Regions:
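Targeting-peptide/extracellular-domain and disordered-appendage signature
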Residues: 1-193
Length: 193
């Protein structure tokens, strides 16, 4: 028997991410959160939030829907990373494309007036399905999520042909092999009614 989630659906799409560092346990030298949104109150679109030594340690935001990028900052992305609640960070207009086969590798391409960016995940691990409810202990996050996470033991970020320092690091998640870098497909976020 099917069960409908009792919470309000606020977005669905994809949210692959990169968290690179030069040594395991060091602060991230690159932190990148990429969204391909199919549905949310501010409409569909793409956005990349990225901070790296290649951005001089400052957040850069690239999007093809500024309203969606700002809505994410005020909701889910702002919850995931409080630094991104700052809606004074400029949003740079960009175009987006993808390539690859997620069983082997995946690349997201972002082009803007000042940057040609590629994010690539490879050495792909076994997918896992995660489902949390809004305000569920122990994290007590305001929003719940249902997503297919695909860990990547290899990943890189390039901006204008230069590769960011750092690598992904192995982690465990729910007792399964995971990484600091992953693809996140079929991702839906909910809030309590």
């Amino acid at each position: 028997m099917a069960v409908a989630d009792p919470h309000r659906l606020i977005l669905t799409g994809e949210n692959p991410f990169l968290r690179l560092s030069e040594k395991d346990g060091d602060p991230n030298s690159t932190d990148a959160s990429y969204w391909r949104i199919l549905f949310c109150p501010a409409g569909p679109g793409h956005v990349l939030y990225v901070k790296s030594e290649m951005t001089h340690g400052h957040w850069r935001i690239y999007s093809d829907n500024i309203a969606m990028a700002r809505w994410l900052q005020q909701t889910v992305q702002g919850m995931l990373n409080a630094e991104l609640k700052d809606t004074t960070i400029p949003v740079i207009d960009a175009s987006f494309s993808k390539s690859g086969d997620p069983r082997y590798f995946w690349t997201e391409h972002i082009k803007a007036h000042d940057a040609d960016i590629a994010m690539t995940w490879y050495d792909i691990g076994e997918p896992l399905l995660i489902h949390t409810e809004p305000n569920q202990p122990p994290q007590n996050r305001q929003y719940g999520v249902c997503t297919v996470l695909v860990p990547a033991m290899g990943a890189r970020l390039t901006i204008n042909g230069n590769q960011a320092r750092g690598t992904p690091w192995k982690r465990d998640r729910e007792g399964r092999p995971f990484s600091t870098c992953a693809l996140a497909f079929s991702e839906s976020w909910t809030e309590a009614r």
